[in-house]
């Protein structure tokens, strides 16, 4: 894959565990309640899942195809729903990955990085509308539709 920015992709690939840890820390900084909502075990699972996010981000940047991240986000959305992780938390995780990755790549690669992460965020926001993930239900409506 040499159609895109191979230098930026190589820098991301070399980031390794430190990049993933910084991405999770950045996500927790962006949303202070992130750590309260998720147990340590869930945060460790998200940290290991970030490896797949970074791999797909590397592919998207190396091939100059930001839609690769959108395809990946569409595939993993169901998995996170089953694990009861909200799509808003995945958007926050992507924003943390954006911050951590921007510190590693060269300034010329940031545009491709932003485009790929924006594609994933768009997909997660689309999936957010399903099953009331976007917001908490109103208590009165929850009482009325309790059987539904």
Regions found by a protein language model. Name each.
Residues 1-91, 95, 99-148:
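Core of compact, soluble alpha-helical bundle domains
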């Amino acid at each position: 894959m040499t159609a895109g920015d191979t230098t930026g992709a190589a820098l991301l690939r070399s980031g390794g565990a430190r990049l993933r840890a910084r991405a999770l820390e950045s996500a927790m900084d962006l949303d202070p309640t992130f750590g309260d909502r998720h147990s340590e075990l869930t945060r460790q699972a998200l940290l290991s899942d970030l490896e797949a996010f970074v791999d797909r981000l590397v592919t998207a940047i190396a091939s100059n195809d930001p839609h690769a991240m959108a395809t990946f986000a569409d595939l993993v959305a169901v998995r996170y729903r089953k694990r009861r992780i909200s799509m808003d938390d995945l958007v926050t995780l992507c924003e943390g990955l954006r911050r951590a990755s921007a510190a590693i790549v060269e300034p010329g690669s940031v545009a491709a990085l932003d485009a790929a992460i924006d594609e994933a965020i768009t997909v997660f926001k689309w999936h957010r509308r399903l099953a009331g993930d976007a917001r908490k239900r109103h208590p009165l409506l929850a009482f009325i539709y309790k059987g539904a």
